[in-house]
Regions:
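Long, well-ordered amphipathic alpha-helical subdomains in the mid-to-C-terminal portions
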Residues: 56-57, 272, 283-361
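Non-catalytic terminal/linker segments enriched in charged/polar, low-complexity residues
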Residues: 1-83, 332, 336-337, 352-353, ...
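Canonical P-loop GTPase G-domain recognition
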Residues: 231, 237-294
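Alpha-helical scaffold elements adjacent to nucleotide-binding pockets in ATP/GTP-utilizing enzyme cores
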Residues: 136, 173, 198, 202, ...
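Flexible active-site lid/hinge loop adjacent to a nucleotide/diphosphate
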Residues: 212-243
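Well-ordered beta-strand positions
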Residues: 184, 205, 230-231, 269
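Short hinge/gating elements
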Residues: 41-46, 94, 99, 157, ...
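Nucleotide-state-sensitive switch-loop elements of NTP-binding domains
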Residues: 40-94, 99, 103-195, 202-209, ...
Length: 366
């Protein structure tokens, strides 16, 4: 191998030592300057109770975290914030993709803040994709007015987790938002699968947004979704679509007659509106507050809140048991083998599951 640097052409050249490390321009900037002081649970609680949305956002991030250390702090913060929660009106908003939920929530939020004052938090239940583990986080960009309003707090869905886990975290986020002084909570869900049922289990009023002019409006709606709806609103009631919307509203009203009377005693209403033009928004929120007054008067409001608290207690038990089962080292070693026996036809799914459960409980006994 040739080394041209050793040739006579370069013989008179020398290599200088060079300069040493450059000193920091700002003498007050020390090593580790980017280290942030870790907040304690007391710091989070203090910031939340003062209405500091930056601290609130950080606390919600702790709630969404799967790190055990974060979870421990989050639970302490939630427990200390619990006495300051429960004073909001919680509204669930659901509808199929394309129904205009985000635009509608933007208009709903601006209207209710203008008419009722106070503060509004917008949350989401959007379980991750089973394939990519990603979820829809673009709603905030479509809420152009609320996203810059000083009295609003918009929190997109966690980016990973099962429906039960995401819903529980949303429920806990509601507690933190209420403690921070948000007296109106919107919980948005994509409106497919079981997410609307989870949403219904944490709100006072469940609003279903529908579209007209898509064929048989009633055919594509699950009976269960209509049964849990306290109000149905048909969006895009403008221009040439007005007659179609009113015709669809009549179809929905007729269909509601075949459903049993809701436990609340309230008769669900069907209204038309335009989220784009903002028409009909006032009537929707008049309906929401009529419902709240109605159920507070007959005692159903408090009853439903208590039932929801019990429901989430049992859901938390189920989730923790599930997590503990799958994190058990013995079970993790046996899962692949159990899968193989099922796929080979040596055992049924139920037998394999029972064997794993028996092993798990025996392992607990030690």
């Amino acid at each position: 191998m040739e080394h041209p640097e050793n040739s006579s052409e370069f013989a008179g050249l020398t290599v200088n030592k060079g300069i040493g490390p450059v000193s920091i321009v700002n003498p007050y900037l020390k090593k580790g300057r980017f280290a942030r002081r870790k907040l304690t649970a007391a710091d989070y609680v203090e910031g939340i109770l003062k209405g500091n949305v930056t601290i609130l956002g950080q606390a919600v991030t702790l709630v969404e975290s799967t790190v055990p250390e974060h979870q421990a702090i989050a639970q302490e913060v939630i427990e200390k914030c619990l006495p300051y929660s429960g004073n909001s009106v919680r509204v669930g908003i659901s509808g199929v993709p394309g129904a205009g939920k985000s635009t509608s929530i933007d208009e709903f939020g601006i209207h209710v803040l203008k008419e009722k004052g106070g503060k509004l938090a917008v949350l989401a239940i959007d379980p991750s994709s089973e394939r990519s583990k990603g979820s829809i986080l673009g709603d905030k960009t479509r809420m152009e007015k609320l996203s810059v309003h000083p009295d609003s707090f918009i929190r997109p869905s966690p980016s990973a987790g099962s429906l039960g886990g995401v819903a529980r975290k949303t429920r806990e986020t509601i507690i933190l938002c209420e403690a921070a002084g948000f007296d109106k909570i919107f919980v948005e869900t994509v409106g497919v699968g079981q997410s609307e049922t989870a949403c219904h289990s944490m709100v006072d009023f469940f609003l279903l947004i529908q579209l007209a002019g898509t064929g048989d409006e009633l055919q594509g709606i699950k009976r269960g979704i209509m049964e849990i709806s306290d109000g149905i609103c048909i969006n895009k009631c403008d221009g040439e679509n007005v007659d179609k919307c009113h015709l669809a509203a009549t179809s929905f009203r007729n269909a509601l007659h075949f459903f049993p009377q809701p436990e609340s005693g309230w008769t669900p209403k069907v209204l038309c509106y335009s989220g784009f033009y903002g028409t009909g928004i006032k009537e929707i929120w008049d309906m929401v507050y009529q419902y709240i007054d109605f159920v507070k008067h007959n005692g159903y409001f408090e009853y439903r809140r208590n039932e929801q608290s019990k429901y989430w207690m049992y859901e938390s038990i189920n989730e923790h048991l599930r997590a503990h089962f799958y994190h058990n080292e013995t079970i993790r070693q046996l899962l692949k083998k159990a899968e193989a026996t099922v796929l080979a036809g040596e055992k049924t799914s139920f037998t394999a599951a029972q064997d794993l459960l028996d092993t798990y409980f025996n392992d607990l006994k030690g």
